[in-house]
């Protein structure tokens, strides 16, 4: 009997132990099923989650931040593209592209990322929202703070930085109590539309370019911007099929013929979109040939008298001899061609001193690029222009180059042709030089005196 009692007790103990083991196994399975046991995520999963959480974001994430998240890269390459330095990083199933403007010391920031050949949405088409003040260091003075939200930041200690940064009408600012004293971006943007140096006074006198055609040869254009859409008489594309709107054309058009920003707001605009990124002069030559043909057409109501091209790379490009022939032909047909080349007309840039009278030549300082003695200086920096990002978007530029100065001079030439249609192209250049007023920074263009001198040539 005792033996059977021990046997039954042992069987019971085994059953209890087995049950406990089964319960433990099921508990472990349930625990794992609920995801409570950490598993190692793949780099692809880490990237997807970081993008979803906003930890990886367009123009905010740096290469070091990505490496801290994913570890050492599998491969990286560095190359130049235009004015940018492009850094490409590769991880298993991941390709990442960073970029920075070479002329500035800002870090490279994220431009594009793909996982398993599928591009991720990192916010390229959305406004960039700065998370903290350190994010300010990631933006350069070329693109600046356009379409950036700074609403979450306290900017009172960043006046020096803000004075170097362009921005646009889409930039979101914090309240006035979080801005530096005296810094008013809305006023800067509006004041920057004024061409300055008495141009608007000439407009009130009826000298606004009416009846005269100006051709701008540049990159593909946002055609419906409210600043110049109603001045666009003709648009023709040459060898740019499939190329989207570029940033260069809208500012140039608005400086020349813009209704609020322009020197000649009533002129007729002829626009030729060309591949300026190709080292070949033929597209410019072809455009000038077509303009001469248009001028010969009796149905052309506003003949083109001025051409504005914001580049000066012609000697370094193919078909330079053909280009020189085109310039000669244009002059023979009474057309003044204004470019950024300095072979026939020396000119340079001014930047407006904000808060000063824009019509006073003493309210300007020299631009960032040096010029030779005797160069005629025209406003370019601290100006507002049309933006390529939307039909009602405007950009306030800080420093500017020759590209913004050429259309200003071209606009003045349009005014000259309105006042005296018979004036020779060379005479326009001579009078711009003779009527410039001397200031502490150099010879500043003087539109009113220039137009008076043009009128005097008509009377002679």
Per-range role (PLM):
Residues 11, 302-309, 321, 418-460:
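C-terminal subdomain of the subtilisin-like protease fold in secreted/lumenal serine endopeptidases
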Residues 19-28:
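Bacterial N-terminal signal peptides
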Residues 33-125:
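Residues within mature, well-folded domains
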Residues 121-190:
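Autoinhibitory propeptides
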Residues 186-214, 238-241, 358-362, 446:
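N-terminal domain-start motif of subtilase-like serine proteases
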Residues 201-214, 219-233, 241-284, 300-304, ...:
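Subtilisin-like serine protease catalytic core
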Residues 218, 332-418, 422:
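Extracellular S/T/G-rich loop segment that most often corresponds to the catalytic His/Ser-adjacent loop
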Residues 275-353, 397-407:
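Substrate-binding/access-modulating region of protease and related hydrolase catalytic domains
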